[in-house]
């Protein structure tokens, strides 16, 4: 019997004006121009935070808040790609690899389609897999709720982990 593991993660961050002339959000490690930045202890990358939580959840290893607490000054402004690679190291150490990841970002703006391939490529690189195993898509909430009012952004990630047959 093959022991697959499935995990799900969600992350939300509020938009805010950081006082800088150039505002942007970082999603899947890609800086995207926007009218606001994201309020967060780290870089606020909801895509990678949701993905990391999904990976941890698949193995019952807690959540990113336990591994990277916002009370630790060392995590201030942390690049979420560093966080994701750390989490994936735990996946590999447990004897698993990523089968695939499916990520949905919910926001009215910014529009993400022009950045889709770059986001997928970053994730595939960090998780040592082919880009065809990574899905990133965006949807609006039809102007409903906090994302509809453009108060923040949300991401949901689902992952499938499979045993690492190569033993690498």
From Swiss-Prot:
UniProt: 4-CDP-2-C-methyl-D-erythritol 2-phosphate binding residues: 11-13, 41-42, 63-65, 68-72, 139-142, 146, 149
Molecular function, one GO term: 2-C-methyl-D-erythritol 2,4-cyclodiphosphate synthase activity
Origin superkingdom: Bacteria
Signal peptide feature range: none
Cofactor, free-text remark: Binds 1 divalent metal cation per subunit.
One GO BP annotation of this record: isopentenyl diphosphate biosynthetic process, methylerythritol 4-phosphate pathway
InterPro entries: MECDP_synthase, MECDP_synthase_CS, MECDP_synthase_sf
Site, Transition state stabilizer: residue positions: 41, 140
Keywords: Isoprene biosynthesis, Lyase, Metal-binding
Protein residues bound to a divalent metal cation: 11, 13, 49
EC number: 4.6.1.12
Cofactor(s) named in the record: a divalent metal cation
Transmembrane portions of the chain: none
The keyword Metal-binding is annotated on this UniProt entry: yes
Family affiliation: Belongs to the IspF family.
Stored HAMAP family: IspF
Purpose of the protein: Involved in the biosynthesis of isopentenyl diphosphate (IPP) and dimethylallyl diphosphate (DMAPP), two major building blocks of isoprenoid compounds. Catalyzes the conversion of 4-diphosphocytidyl-2-C-methyl-D-erythritol 2-phosphate (CDP-ME2P) to 2-C-methyl-D-erythritol 2,4-cyclodiphosphate (ME-CPP) with a corresponding release of cytidine 5-monophosphate (CMP).
Name this polypeptide is given: 2-C-methyl-D-erythritol 2,4-cyclodiphosphate synthase
Species, as recorded: Psychrobacter cryohalolentis (strain ATCC BAA-1226 / DSM 17306 / VKM B-2378 / K5)
Gene behind the chain: ispF
């Amino acid at each position: 019997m093959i022991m697959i593991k499935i995990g799900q993660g969600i992350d939300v961050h509020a938009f805010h004006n950081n006082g800088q002339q150039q505002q942007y959000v970082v999603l899947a490690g890609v800086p995207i121009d926007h009218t606001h930045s994201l309020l967060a202890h780290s870089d606020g990358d909801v895509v990678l935070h949701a993905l990391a939580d999904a990976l941890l959840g698949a193995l019952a290893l807690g959540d990113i808040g336990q591994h990277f607490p916002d009370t630790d000054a060392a995590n201030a402004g942390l690049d979420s790609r560093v966080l994701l690679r750390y989490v994936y190291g735990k996946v590999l150490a447990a004897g698993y690899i990523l089968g695939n990841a499916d990520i949905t970002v919910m926001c009215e703006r910014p529009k993400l389609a022009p950045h889709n391939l770059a986001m997928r490529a970053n994730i595939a690189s960090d998780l040592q897999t082919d880009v065809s195993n990574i899905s990133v898509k965006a949807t609006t909430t039809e102007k409903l709720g906090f994302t509809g009012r453009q108060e923040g952004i949300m991401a949901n990630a689902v992952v499938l982990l499979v045993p690492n047959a190569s033993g690498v």
